[in-house]
Swiss-Prot record:
The modification N-acetylalanine is found at residue 2. One of its GO terms (molecular function) is ATP-dependent activity, acting on DNA. Induction: Repressed by DNA-bound peptides. It comes from the Eukaryota. Phosphorylation of Ser-164 during mitosis inactivates the enzyme. Phosphorylation of Thr-170 is required for activity. Phosphorylated at Ser-164 and Thr-170 by CDK2. CDD domains: STKc_CDK7. Belongs to the protein kinase superfamily. CMGC Ser/Thr protein kinase family. CDC2/CDKX subfamily. This is Cyclin-dependent kinase 7. GO terms for cellular component: CAK-ERCC2 complex; cyclin-dependent protein kinase holoenzyme complex; cytoplasm; cytosol; fibrillar center; male germ cell nucleus; nucleoplasm; nucleus. It is found in: Nucleus; Cytoplasm; Cytoplasm, Perinuclear region. It catalyses: L-seryl-[protein] + ATP = O-phospho-L-seryl-[protein] + ADP + H(+); L-threonyl-[protein] + ATP = O-phospho-L-threonyl-[protein] + ADP + H(+); [DNA-directed RNA polymerase] + ATP = phospho-[DNA-directed RNA polymerase] + ADP + H(+). The gene is CDK7. The modification Phosphothreonine is found at residue 170.
Amino acid sequence: MALDVKSRAKRYEKLDFLGEGQFATVYKARDKNTNQIVAIKKIKLGHRSEAKDGINRTALREIKLLQELSHPNIIGLLDAFGHKSNISLVFDFMETDLEVIIKDNSLVLTPSHIKAYMLMTLQGLEYLHQHWILHRDLKPNNLLLDENGVLKLADFGLAKSFGSPNRAYTHQVVTRWYRAPELLFGARMYGVGVDMWAVGCILAELLLRVPFLPGDSDLDQLTRIFETLGTPTEEQWPDMCSLPDYVTFKSFPGIPLHHIFSAAGDDLLDLIQGLFLFNPCARITATQALKMKYFSNRPGPTPGCQLPRPNCPVETLKEQSNPALAIKRKRTEALEQGGLPKKLIF
């Protein structure tokens, strides 16, 4: 068994260091058997005492789920093997991510580009939800793009099967800026709506080229949501007041969506409105979103091979584009993950 693990590890030739997070290091490598370029995510499992932090559970969950999934818009897990206190996951190599594209001010994102990114995101998400899986951590840097412009959902460390009646989940999921209001109010029972709200935030970020609702705390996040979209009433969201962490907010009128997204047509505004419905039971699903007029109306989505590619190194873009927001994003993610990331997080 040990020889098998060692031979599998030797199968991959490391080519470049891609990034490091609190629990994982990512390398670009070449599969010597197939000559395929891959990404290896080396996770530090640690000792049993550290397993209480969920490191082991997160890695095993990601492996288990990805082994069962196969879709053009879901990252492919090619191999997985353990050695000592580490486990290595071998993935499709992806050239960049949506956060890099959004931040590269030298790129012009046309309506057709944005439609293509949203189409691929929703197709991958529809597949997940049809297989009773919530991603629970959708954000631009978890939407990866390969050299052919194909977008794939990645980082399934927080993903979870759903559908069991009366089953409670943790509400401490999804990076705060993309977190649905029901999670911010402490909901323990939730469904696909948490992913759909995150998609709405990603779509808004594609249109505005900056994070839509960059809150500093859960309370500030809710305040930003209500100031922008209006404070929901009990008629709009019947179960709101019964949520564990519900607090009463000032009644904000909100800003009309066509004022925020002034270049968006009615079909796109309808999609945005459906994604940002406060009542999670009324919020549109991925399947419903894909059937909306926005995706059938002109212009059509840009083919993947014609989508823009970043002109600057990834690190330069992530650190130099809007430095204040970049620092704020890193600080927010670090606090939620319990430590400071050293470089890119795969």
